[in-house]
Amino acid sequence: MDGDRGKRDSYWSTSPSGSTTKLASGWERSSKVDTWLLILSFTQWALSIATVIICIIISARQGYSTKEYSMTVEALNMSSREVKESLTSLIRQEVIARAVNIQSSVQTGIPVLLNKNSRDVIQMIDKSCSRQELTQLCESTIAVHHAEGIAPLEPHSFWRCPVGEPYLSSDPKISLLLGPSLLSGSTTISGCVRLPSLSIGEAIYAYSSNLITQGCADIGKSYQVLQLGYISLNSDMFPDLNPVVSHTYDINDNRKSCSVVATGTRGYQLCSMPTVDERTDYSSDGIEDLVLDVLDLKGSTKSHRYRNSEVDLDHPFSALYPSVGNGIATEGSLIFLGYGGLTTPLQGDTKCRTQGCQQVSQDTCNEALKITWLGGKQVVNVIIRVNDYLSERPKIRVTTIPITQNYLGAEGRLLKLGDRVYIYTRSSGWHSQLQIGVLDVSHPLTINWTPHEALSRPGNKECNWYNTCPKECISGVYTDAYPLSPDAANVATVTLYANTSRVNPTIMYSNTTNIINMLRIKDVQLEVAYTTISSCITHFGKGYCFHIIEINQKSLNTLQPMLFKTSIPKLCKAES
């Protein structure tokens, strides 16, 4: 303790400039005051004794009268008072000087030192957090997290019952849950918000959307807005998306087709930066630039731009885009789904169906991957792996999903739930039914698709809701689904419940053969765009889904994503 006191006194006796400041400790000040008071008391006692002795001597030896004696005593008392006042004044001046010194130090010196020390600590932490190996430790100090009990829905733990078997119930009918929506929008009447992408991580979520200031053409200059936030519970105990930080990327960069990942306390988005329209891109060799954006909860952002020569491609591509839907984080890498056109087509037999179809063969299916409207390029899906994503310059590697495992390449998303990776791809070709399955990301890439007969999407006349026979077409809409059971047989989705038109958005809970429970958002005439998202969570085992739909604001002729929420109608069937 004495050693600590010595260090402390030594520390506070030094000003920020390094000069010595003479500050007495509390103990030293108390000792000095006690010493002065002792001296004063002793002096008064000595004077009193001396006065009495002098008076006695004077009276005895000289026989002074009583009057003269009184005058002498009075003179001595006055002298004593003068000495007392002088000593008191001296002590008071010393104490006041010390008090002023202490007050100055408390009001000025100490705060300056504390501020300096605080800055030193902050700089030390920031410097440490810039080191890759300490990134996760530093991120964990930021106190932003989903509400207690909230986590991404994991099918293996959700699709079970304490007693009996789980199933989707048709009764009661699902309804929309109350709560606010804080999705980014436009500040202009003619502005158009497109291509929403949502990733729900263990701690935070990331949401991205594209804002075109005039009209909805994909090639128009646009802002990209990336939000990070957490999921809370409102007063009705329903989950809400609460944005914490948002960043708007330069309109002149024209980011398009962005996919997001939320992991740790950061959001990542991978975008294309096209300088030409889609058809022109497919007709030329090489891909448009890609950009990886990083945003953290402090609002700090970093971007990495990659040209064709800087991307490790397993085959030459004429066009390549992130798939709009979210990606995943796994084993030190970010993995995004992508799609694009190969410069030279791959050989092999793609997914096909010939039963019940006239004049159809495997060659029909193979040729259907080559889209005339896109310069006859073979359109495939790819895995875009961002390795060392915490480093100063992450590396991008692209691996093509074999055509033997896939349908026509298109937009889609990946979900890592438990130990499985689920894949959804938009039904852009002749295969109109929902395309969802389990993806093995090891080598070679394989997909175990779950056949769905009940769910489909609107398309053009040749490839409408009911089409199941192979032919060349490019149509459909992005209406992803979230797996509720491990085999992806039970899903939550938003479907445009129409044959050929993008109308009638309907929230559906379905198995492979039947639509079990559904809710029409408004009416069959409500127009939408081609992106609907469903992402689900649990709150202490209770399931909820967020649905984001691009609604056509008909009176303004613009598109705006809107957020809806439902409770999952899962029940447990009692054993007989």
Swiss-Prot record:
Membrane topology term: Single-pass type II membrane protein
Pfam families: HN (PF00423)
Listed InterPro entries: Hemagglutn-neuramid (IPR016285), Hemagglutn/HN (IPR000665), Sialidase_sf (IPR036278)
Listed SUPFAM superfamilies: Sialidases
Transmembrane portions of the chain: 38-58
The record's account of how the chain is modified after translation: N-glycosylated; glycans consist of a mixture of high mannose-type oligosaccharides and of complex-type oligosaccharides.
Ranges of compositional bias, category Polar residues: 11-23
Sequence ranges on the Virion surface membrane side: 59-576
Region (Involved in neuraminidase activity): 254-259
Entry EC no(s): 3.2.1.18
Region (Disordered): 1-24
Subcellular location: Virion membrane; Host cell membrane
Molecular function via GO: exo-alpha-sialidase activity; host cell surface receptor binding
Basic and acidic residues: compositionally biased ranges: 1-10
An example Gene Ontology CC term for this record: virion membrane
Side of membrane Intravirion, spans: 1-37
Biological process, per Gene Ontology: symbiont entry into host cell; virion attachment to host cell
Chain positions carrying an annotated carbohydrate: N77, N499, N511
CDD domains in alphabetical order: HN
Catalytic activity: Hydrolysis of alpha-(2->3)-, alpha-(2->6)-, alpha-(2->8)- glycosidic linkages of terminal sialic acid residues in oligosaccharides, glycoproteins, glycolipids, colominic acid and synthetic substrates
Record keywords, A-Z: Disulfide bond, Glycoprotein, Hemagglutinin, Host cell membrane, Host membrane, Host-virus interaction, Hydrolase, Membrane, Signal-anchor, Transmembrane, Transmembrane helix, Viral attachment to host cell, Viral envelope protein, Virion, Virus entry into host cell
Family per record: Belongs to the paramyxoviruses hemagglutinin-neuraminidase family.
Subunit structure and binding partners: Homotetramer; composed of disulfide-linked homodimers. Interacts with F protein trimer.
Domain notes: The C-terminus (head domain) is involved in binding the cellular receptor.
Free-text function comment from the UniProt entry: Attaches the virus to sialic acid-containing cell receptors and thereby initiating infection. Binding of HN protein to the receptor induces a conformational change that allows the F protein to trigger virion/cell membranes fusion.
Name of the protein in question: Hemagglutinin-neuraminidase
Organism: Sendai virus (strain Harris) (SeV)
